[in-house]
Amino acid sequence: MSSRFARSNGNPNHIRKRNHSPDPIGIDNYKRKRLIIDLENLSLNDKGPKNGHADDNNLIHNNIVFTDAIDDKVLKEIIKCSTSKRGDNDLFYDKIWERLREKRLQIIKWVDYKEIAYLSWWKWFHNQMTSKYTYDGEADTDVEMMAVDTDVDMDA
């Protein structure tokens, strides 16, 4: 039998699996950052990678995984709530997940793309038509209109 399994207290024939991690977001982000560090340290040189091993101190501090997904304010609030002695663990985790979910929710405005395309075409079309058929008073003057009778008798 594998050492990762443990026997149940009630039934000696019943095998109980080990518990999963309670923090899947932190584990996933830790693995992602660890993979990035490992990829940065890859080298084709004969000497090997730049660093012999990646430093975990940058990834974990006081058993809290620093992630890009958790905002600093939310993280500070989580740490503050976890150190205080008020409330049940279930309520605490519910508050954490609720705040993370609210922080990451996005409202996407629905847009009618057919209407936007039609209005864009309509504006373009009318701009094309109005630019061709405009009346420019200065450009349409005729030379004959400028002719002035210079033989006017001023003494009369």
Curated annotation (Swiss-Prot):
Entry-annotated residues carrying Phosphoserine: 21
Domain of life: Eukaryota
Keyword Cytoplasm tagged: yes
GO cellular component: cytoplasm; nucleus
Compositionally biased spans, kind Polar residues: 1-12
Keywords from the UniProt entry: Cytoplasm, Nucleus, Phosphoprotein
Keyword Phosphoprotein: yes
Localisation per UniProt entry: Cytoplasm; Nucleus
Region (Disordered): 1-27
Main location: cytoplasm
The protein, known as: Uncharacterized protein YPL071C
Species this chain originates from: Saccharomyces cerevisiae (strain ATCC 204508 / S288c)
